[in-house]
């Protein structure tokens, strides 16, 4: 199992294991988060995950999830028409031209674009800070904390949290397509006020709730 957390957590895990004489039947790979700069946490054929520093009263990170550019889709009728083999298809889908029976085949002539790569940024807990924008520029969806409404802007600054308006400003500056608000203070009964406030700056805004799910379209 891979664990990503502040470095001091490893001391706690080790102390717990020593006291309890715990022996895992799996490998535990501990990865200390970097609170000073962006860091790649995960990378496979489909997805990349990055952490980036945010501005809070204790060291804290945001996270960026980015799908990699997908393979192109082969036009099925071309397989039989051109006598394409499995190896040829693989090359063409990966944007490589190939030679089939002495004939040059361009990938653009026999494939169509695949699904659009999607992206999602999670920004919490954090004070309003435009320094995060380069890390999340052009992201599809941003989740940004909005602990307070604008009437408590000063309190938000002191406690290093954000208002709904400030979350909207981040989404607008980052050129995001959608903003999800969350981390609301318990003092508020009407969460819709957060959406109303943020929507005056960034129209495509919704509020998260327990069990909230959102499908990012390709």
What are the residue ranges of the model-derived segments?
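A short helix-to-beta-strand connector/capping loop
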Residues: 24-29, 44-45, 117-118, 201-204
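Hydrophobic side chains in beta-strands
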Residues: 5, 65-67, 216
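Active-site-proximal loop/helix segment associated with metal-binding centers of metalloenzymes
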Residues: 42, 47-122, 126-135, 141-143
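Short "lid" loop at the C-terminus of a central beta-strand within the Rossmann-like core
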Residues: 8-9, 55, 148-149
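Active-site HxH/HxHxD metal-binding segment of metal-dependent hydrolases
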Residues: 1-33
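General small-molecule cofactor/ligand-binding pocket signal
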Residues: 4, 29-34, 50-52, 206-208
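Binuclear metal-ion centers of metallo-dependent hydrolases, dominated by the metallo-beta-lactamase
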Residues: 33-38, 129-218
